[in-house]
Structure formats: structure tokens, C-alpha cells
Design a protein with these regions (language model features):
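Hydrophobic alpha-helical transmembrane segments of polytopic membrane proteins
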Residues: 206-245
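Short cytosolic juxtamembrane segments of multi-pass membrane proteins
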Residues: 245-262
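Transmembrane alpha-helices
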Residues: 127, 131, 164-197, 224, ...
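Generic hydrophobic transmembrane alpha-helix motif, especially the helices
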Residues: 100-136, 143-144
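Short cytoplasmic-facing helical segments at TM-TM junctions of multi-pass membrane proteins
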Residues: 140-182
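Transmembrane-helix boundary motif in ABC transporter permease subunits
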Residues: 69-99
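N-terminal signal-anchor transmembrane alpha helix
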Residues: 5-28
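Periplasmic/extracellular loop-to-transmembrane helix junction in inner-membrane transport proteins
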Residues: 27-72
Length: 262
């Protein structure tokens, strides 16, 4: 499907979503604010200082700061653990069950335990978010490491490639699709946990604003904050991740009927 058709289908899906949203506001006006009410609240949020006399971009930046820092930590730790598990049978046999147990721990429990251990401040978030999302990255990279083609490694050794050169030119290119899958899953999970941390522990960030306006039952304003942060994530996906993925997978030939680049 070419970009024009994809753009049309995307626009159509957005219109359908907005239509369903408006229909929901008609059916249940006490629970779902209308599109126009949310748009009005959005304009107010974008132009008027909120609690503690802070503009919207302060809260978006604080949430993005925690999310991106913890995402980077999780990607490094998860990639190292995943590659180690996928390339070492002893480690895989010893630690695989612990990874699945780690995945089963509820994120909310991790947030509360971090708060008890460290305190009700931002440090708890910087601990809780990596703990919660690192196993998802590790699981993706583990599967990627298990699918590495050993013949490529043998060929690199035959031509005298060193360990670093093999890692950079043979292993990493094969793991790129799994790395981007890890980034997307970590981002989608990480922002939810970041908002939980802010809602329960902090007095700044998008999560705090959600809780603040939920407590006041200002649903239109709460929805406007959701629109702001979803827009931020869409920019990250299509403005950063998609172009980067296309660039890093440009060397891969397209299989018939399959698009490897977005």
C-alpha cells in the first residue's frame, strides 16, 4: 500500500474515532465529554497556566523526561540481558523462568514498593519504570538473539572479523527489527507506568494533571490532556522512530508482498 492510500485510511480511521467519540458523548454525556467541549478545554490548557502556575509544556516535558530516561535505561539493560539469554544456553536455562516471573509482577505493585523503599518523589519513578519495562525489552531481544543466523557469524570469523566488528556488522543488523519492537513495546508500556507514578506520587507531569482534573470531575480538561500526550507519542513514533527504522533497515531487500520499511 502506497503512502497516499495509507494516509487516506489513517484519516478515515481518525474520523471514525472522532465520530464514535461524539456519539458516545450524546449517549452518555455525564461520562464522555463532547469533541467540542474537549477542544475548548484543550485551548484553555494550551493558553492558561494550570496548578502551581505552570504551563502545559512544563508538565509534558517532565513526563517526557522521566519516560525517555527510563526508556533508555530499560533498553540498555533489556538488550544486554536478552542477548545474553539468547546466546548462552546455561544462562537461558537458569534465568528464563525468572524473566516470566518478572513479567507477571503488576506495575502498580512495583510503583508502590518503589515509593515505600525510596520515598514519594520522582526517584521512585526512575526506579519503578525501568523495573517494570526491562523484562519486556529482554523478552523481545531474547527472541531476536535466538533467531541469529550462525552461518553469518561463521562467515565473519572466516574472513577475520573481530568481535566488535562482528557485533556491529553482523549481530546488530539482524537484531534491528527486534530492537524497534522492543522500543515500541517499552514506550507503550512505559508511558502508562510513568503516568501512574505521577498520578499517585508527584505534583507535576501529565499523570498528575489527569488525577487533578479527575478529582475535580473536569472530564473535558482531563481528555484534553490525553489528546496532548497522545499527540506527543504520535510525533515520537512517526517523526523519530519510523524514519530511523527506515534508515537502519534500508539494506534489507523487500520480500515479495512484504514491506520491511514503513
Amino acid at each position: 500500500m502506497d503512502r497516499t492510500k495509507r494516509g487516506l485510511w489513517t484519516a478515515l480511521s481518525v474520523l471514525v474515532l472522532v465520530g464514535l467519540w461524539q456519539l458516545g458523548s450524546v449517549v452518555a454525556p455525564e461520562s464522555i465529554p463532547s469533541v467540542l467541549a474537549t477542544a475548548g478545554a484543550l485551548i484553555t490548557v494550551l493558553t492558561t497556566p494550570g496548578p502551581y502556575d505552570r504551563m502545559f509544556y512544563y508538565h509534558v516535558w517532565k513526563t517526557a523526561e522521566m519516560l525517555l530516561i527510563t526508556l533508555g535505561i530499560s533498553l540498555v539493560l533489556g538488550t544486554v540481558v536478552g542477548i545474553a539469554l539468547g546466546t548462552d544456553e546455561t544462562l537461558e536455562s537458569s534465568l528464563s523462568s525468572w524473566i516470566y516471573a518478572w513479567l507477571a509482577i503488576p506495575s502498580l505493585v512495583i510503583v508502590f514498593v518503589a515509593a515505600v523503599l525510596i520515598g514519594f518523589d520522582a526517584r521512585s519513578g526512575y526506579l519503578a519504570v525501568p523495573i517494570a519495562i526491562t523484562p519486556f525489552v529482554a523478552l523481545n531481544m531474547w527472541e531476536g538473539a535466538r533467531s541469529l543466523d550462525p552461518q553469518l557469524g561463521e562467515m565473519a570469523e572466516f574472513f577475520g572479523a573481530g568481535r566488535y566488528q562482528q557485533f556491529r556488522a553482523v549481530i546488530i543488523p539482524q537484531l534491528v527489527p527486534f530492537l524497534f519492537a522492543s522500543i515500541r513495546s517499552a514506550l507503550s508500556i512505559g508511558w502508562k507506568i510513568t503516568l501512574l507514578v505521577e498520578a499517585f506520587l508527584l505534583t507535576r507531569g501529565v499523570g498528575f494533571m489527569f488525577r487533578n482534573y479527575f478529582d475535580q470531575y473536569e472530564l473535558a480538561t482531563m481528555m484534553s490532556w490525553l489528546v496532548i500526550f497522545v499527540a506527543f507519542l504520535v510525533v515520537i513514533e512517526y517523526g523519530v522512530l519510523a524514519p530511523l527504522r527506515r534508515r537502519m533497515t534500508a539494506w534489507r531487500p523487500d520480500a515479495e508482498g512484504v514491506r520491511l520499511s514503513e
